[in-house]
Amino acid sequence: LYMYGQKVSSTIIFFFFLFDSFQLIPEKVIGLKTLDLAIIYILFLFIWGLCKYKDYIPRNKSTLIIGLFLTFIFFEMLLSHFHYGISWSEIIRTGRQHLLLLSYFVFRRLDKEEINQSLKILFVVVIIQSFLFIIQAFTGVGILNNSELFFKKGNLFRFYNISLMHYFFVFYAIFCNPFKSFYKWSTMIIAIITIFLPMHRSLSMAFILLFVLGILWVNHVFNSVKRTIILLCCLFVLITTVSTYISIRTMEDINKVAAGDYQELEDVKLSSESTFLFRVAHFYERYTTMLEDNVGKWLGLGFMTEGSPYTEAHFDFMIGLENEDGGIDQIDTPDISWSIFVIRYGIIGTILFLILYFYFIVYYFRYQSHGTICIVMILYLLLIFTTSLTSDLLYKINMLIFPLIYIDQWEDPPKNKMIQKNIDNDIFK
């Protein structure tokens, strides 16, 4: 479809594969991992583009930074096999997600109108997912994929399978909603309600702060230096007040971990509210192990898979979630991104990833005058980053696809002539 000019339809199919068939069709029905299909899609179109266009890979900062990070990933794969002795099958299973960054070269061939249309269709999909998620929360009946894990909390049921696309589209619904009147308000309300239903306190707090920031931003409050200073002072007082208890508990947790006091962690499972002590200890245990390896502390300990013979033979961490076999997950965790970073990437790789990540934020900040979608991208990236201590979303490369969509859209002269429709009808302007 992409090769025959049907780029919008092709993009929707790609996102269908990228985000677990929109959580509507179980993976066992499809027969393959949908993420693998998304990777094959991108890899095929990337190779096709290289053969068709002479200027397919532009000489710009985006290419340089993406290329630098992918070069590190390629080197890490070689290091994993020839230095650590990890099998190629494990390395490919772990490292293949990074090929999704090649989608930058695929999406830059779309014009703004095609991108806007694709996002509008995906927005409708997310609203349908959100409606089904709300039904889950009120009935306790699993509808979307991965709904097996849930708990009753008060009059509601706490499910963890909120759509990964929702983190972007909740801001899109508020600030770039393509619909009018009733449909605009109803879709916005559904999106906002859904973001609170997983009942993650850190996610809820981060969203509220970024929501307020976004409202002030689109109303140009920050254009006045005086108002900006007053606002920042108020936010500082608010954040300081809210975090007083959290800070005290955090220092107690860190002191316990440093003293080797893990007694409170013995019964921590997904069925209970994971404490910050658990997350700090999870990171601390893996960080200190990484520092003991002269190569690993800089370049990571390799691309091994969870539960493999190599992993079981080389790691014996005490802190982690209990797996199906009654053991402890050594590498993967949904509770914190940084534990995975230090194991997989080491210090150098983590720094390179952060350079890539904050490049996106700076890029969209620079072009914020070209459309509110830039503000949406920044808020989305900040949400993922601020929740990195309580989730693994920052490590998921598929979460970077949305920022990659609009990169170069304001730099290519022919594309600058396109009229950006349905992107700036902000409800708070």
Please identify what each model-predicted range represents.
Residues 235-293, 299-305:
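Aromatic-rich transmembrane-lumenal/periplasmic boundary elements in polytopic membrane proteins
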Residues 1-265, 327-418, 422-426:
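Hydrophobic transmembrane helix bundles of membrane-integrated enzymes that assemble
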Residues 143, 273, 277-345:
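Long extracytoplasmic/lumenal interhelical loops at the membrane interface
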